[in-house]
Amino acid sequence: MDVVCLDLEGVLIPEIWIAFAEKTGIDALRATTRDVPDYDELMGQRLRIVKENNFKLGDIQKVIEELEPLPGAVSFLDDLREHYQVIILSDTYYEFTRPLMKQLNWPTLFCHKLVTDPEGYVTGYKLRQPDPKRMSVKS
């Protein structure tokens, strides 16, 4: 069986942090790994901004619930699944993706997890594994 691995944001769905930046008007949240290649530095920047602006995970999730897959993404995935095992490898978070995964007919997704406090504030994140995309494809 052949396997096809895809990224998620910017490929099948809009960039989540950019959508949140547009909704909140905070341009600094538009930064992606193209702008800040060091993922830990980028996430530190994002989490600092979210904390400074008193946003909770639920605030981000509300914006995500309004998003839809990019045009053609659902049919593209459905067609791929007829011939291949499809795995999505993403630097996003399970806590972000549920509404979009439903719209994409629940593809297999490997991504990271957010850490939240009892009040719902995002306090950190846990990588699925170091260098996750490269290691997944390598195996």
What are these regions (language model features)?
Residues 2-118:
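Alpha-helical substrate-recognition element adjacent to the catalytic core
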Residues 128-139:
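Conserved Lys-Pro-Asp/Glu-containing loop-to-beta segment of HAD-superfamily phosphomonoesterases
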